[in-house]
Amino acid sequence: MANTMEAGRSAATGDARTKAALETAGGPRAPKLAGAPHEGRSIVAVDGLVKRYGEVLALDHFNLRIEPGEVFGLLGPNGSGKTTAINCMLQLLTFDKGTIELFGEPMRPSRYDLKRRIGVVPQNVAVFEELTVRENIDYFCALYVSDRARRRDLVDEAVAFAGLEGYERFRPRKLSGGLLRRLNIACGIAHKPELVFFDEPTVAVDPQSRNAILEGIRQMNRAGSTVVYTSHYMEEVEEICTRLMIMDRGRALATGTNAELKAMVDAGEKIQVDVPEFPDAALERLRALPHVRRALYRDGVLELACANGTHNLGDVLAVLQAFGAAFGRVWAEPPTLNDVFLEITGTELRD
């Protein structure tokens, strides 16, 4: 029983570990992946997934398809169901209804053959304090690879990929935060998973570490891993994901590439105007214009989403002048994922 509990804990920790190796931007090349090639079917297929926590509906008939080689983003606010969906896919949670297939095969708790092909990077970092860096990596790798000689080679590769040479005999408490993240990643990728789940991997890290994490994910993807990436950081998802899904309240609201999602909601250019003071009545007048889909005012900036971009700018400026609102710089910006999220859900997803 103790071994079973340890294995369960290790699977979860493997998630966070992958984060760390990602911090080693510009490090050694990601090792090539092992495992049978995927045979033309979706690597992840979820249909009609329902998960309840008492009266709370965490997943509401959730559907998902992820193809081999993608970096697929699950985008949504905290509580949108991203982590719940991943935990159901990994069989860490039971669910009330629906089906899950990974690698074209039904996923069940007993499918250890499928679990060996998966890596998990949870939001919270977790390693064994009593083990050294190398022992931690070897422990988690041993859950998937029994041959000691093969495992020794895999651990060597993971140490190099994570930039942990010289730290192999250190215990986690002696490592800096960045090195600890590298250890987490090394443990998660040592067995060379074909499918890797990253759950909010850049929460509470500095910008430099965040960039390194993203570069590490790119390296893994170039080496052949399919990546499932959850985040509520818009810029991150826009930068790294080849395709993404917008989630809210346990539902999949829209799926596509960045460009497809913007086209889906006709998220044209945003007009922005520096306005030191702007009365609520003027804002309501702008919202009443037929071509204005959205008007927000905050921090001295008026932000407008217009159906025709800047073509109706004259009408906007006329409203400002009618209310005696002094304005300065006027400029247009391309739409962002936050604009798409706002159009689809009616709320903003702020970093």
Regions from the PLM with identified roles:
Residues 138, 142, 149-167:
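Conserved ABC ATPase "signature" region
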Residues 196-200:
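Catalytic Walker B motif of ABC-type/P-loop ATPase nucleotide-binding domains
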Residues 214-307:
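ABC transporter nucleotide-binding domain
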Residues 192:
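Conserved catalytic motifs of ABC-family nucleotide-binding domains
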Residues 98-106, 114:
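Conserved ABC transporter NBD signature motif
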